[in-house]
Design a protein with these regions (language model features):
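Bacterial Sec-dependent N-terminal signal peptides
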Residues: 1-21
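GH16 jelly-roll
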Residues: 18-321
Length: 321
C-alpha cells in the first residue's frame, strides 16, 4: 500500500514538473461565435492537395458549435453529401499560413474526430510556412521552383510536412479497425520526383477507440527530434506513437527541412488515395455521385446530414528558460 501511494505521488510530481517546463505562447480556444480570421484562412477549392479527393472545400462547412455531449464550444468541420460545384460532397479545410507559425516547442490539439467508417480522411497537420500559396501537393509545379526561390517560397515537399494525426487509412478499413487505427508522418525532400521523396509514416492500432470522443494529440518538436503523443493529459508517461531524429542536416535528411516556421492545417477529406477511394483522375474537373469511389463511401449519411469533426482547442507552448 505504501509503495503504491509513493508511486502515485511521484507520478503526480513528475506530471506537474513536466507541465511547468512549458509556457503557453499562443492558443485558439474556439470560444467565440465566429472563426478568428486573424489566425485562420479558409479554403474554397476542389484541388484536394493532389490526392484525388472527392470533396469541394468550402467556408460554409466551417461552423462554431457547442458539442452536444460535453458542452464545449468548438470549431467544427462538416462533411456532407450535396451536389456542389461539380462535386458530390462538401467539406472543410483551414490553415494559419502567414498568420500563425510554430518553430519548435509543443503543439496540443483536443479533437473529437468523426467515425471515419469507409471514406473519411480527417487530419491535423503542419506545413512549412515558406510553401508557395495556393499550390499544395502538386507534382506539376516543380518547374516553378526557380521563380519561387526568388520570392522566398518553395514547393512541396521542400517546405516539409508534419502530420500530427491522420485517420481513415485503407488498412483500417480492410481490417475493421477504423476507429482505433491512426498515424503520424513527416514528408520532406527537394522535389516531388514522381513520388520518390523521403518520408516516414508510423501507424498505430490503439487499445481503445480514438474516434467519436475527444482526445489530446501532442507534437513535441526540437532541433534534434520530432515526437507525437496520444492522450498525454490522461497518461503523462505514454510513449510516442511517432518519432523522428532531426540530427542529420544534409540535403534529403530530415533535419534539413524541419528547422523553420510551420503553419497549422485542419481538414476533413472525403476519399482520395489514403483510404483507397480516389477519383478517376488526380485533378478531375467533374466528379459525380456515380463515381465508383464515391459509391464506396459509407461515412456520409444519404440524407445529407453533416458528419462533424470537433476541435476544442489548439495550444502552442515554448520551453521555459
Amino acid at each position: 500500500m505504501k509503495k503504491s501511494l509513493l508511486f502515485a505521488l511521484c507520478s503526480l510530481v513528475l506530471s506537474a514538473c513536466a507541465k511547468n517546463e512549458w509556457q503557453l505562447v499562443w492558443s485558439d480556444e474556439f470560444d467565440a461565435d465566429t472563426l478568428n480570421t486573424a489566425y485562420w484562412n479558409t479554403e474554397d477549392n476542389a484541388r484536394g492537395g493532389g490526392n484525388a479527393e472527392l470533396q469541394y472545400y468550402t467556408p460554409k462547412n466551417i461552423t462554431m458549435e457547442v458539442h452536444p455531449v460535453t458542452g464545449e464550444h468548438c470549431l467544427v468541420l462538416n462533411a456532407q453529401r450535396e451536389d456542389y460545384k461539380n462535386r458530390p460532397c462538401t467539406s472543410a479545410r483551414l490553415n494559419t499560413h502567414d498568420k500563425v507559425t510554430v518553430e519548435y516547442g509543443k503543439v496540443e490539439a483536443r479533437i473529437a474526430f468523426p467515425y471515419t467508417a469507409d471514406g473519411l480522411w480527417p487530419a491535423f497537420w503542419m506545413l512549412g510556412n515558406n510553401l508557395a500559396k495556393n499550390l499544395g501537393n502538386d507534382d506539376s509545379i516543380d518547374q516553378q521552383a526557380a521563380q519561387l526561390a526568388n520570392e522566398g517560397r518553395v514547393v512541396w515537399p521542400k517546405c516539409g510536412e508534419i502530420d500530427i494525426c491522420e485517420m481513415g487509412h485503407h488498412f483500417g478499413i480492410e481490417n475493421g479497425i477504423q476507429d482505433r487505427y491512426f498515424n503520424g508522418a513527416c514528408h520532406w525532400g527537394e522535389s516531388f520526383n514522381n513520388g520518390a521523396y523521403p518520408n516516414i509514416g508510423m501507424f498505430r492500432t490503439e487499445d481503445y477507440p480514438v474516434q467519436g470522443d475527444f482526445h489530446l494529440f501532442t507534437l513535441i518538436w526540437s532541433e534534434d527530434s520530432i515526437a507525437m503523443y496520444l492522450d498525454q493529459d490522461k497518461y503523462p508517461e505514454v510513449k510516442p506513437y511517432f518519432q523522428l531524429s532531426l540530427r542529420g542536416k544534409q540535403i534529403n535528411e530530415p533535419g534539413h527541412y524541419f528547422n523553420h516556421p510551420f503553419y497549422l492545417v485542419l481538414n476533413l477529406s472525403v476519399g482520395g488515395f489514403f483510404p483507397n477511394m480516389p477519383a478517376a483522375e488526380k485533378y478531375p474537373e467533374i466528379i459525380t455521385a456515380d463515381d465508383p469511389s464515391f459509391q464506396r463511401v459509407t461515412a456520409l449519411p444519404a440524407d445529407g446530414t453533416p458528419v462533424k469533426m470537433y476541435v476544442d482547442f489548439i495550444r502552442v507552448y515554448k520551453k521555459r528558460g
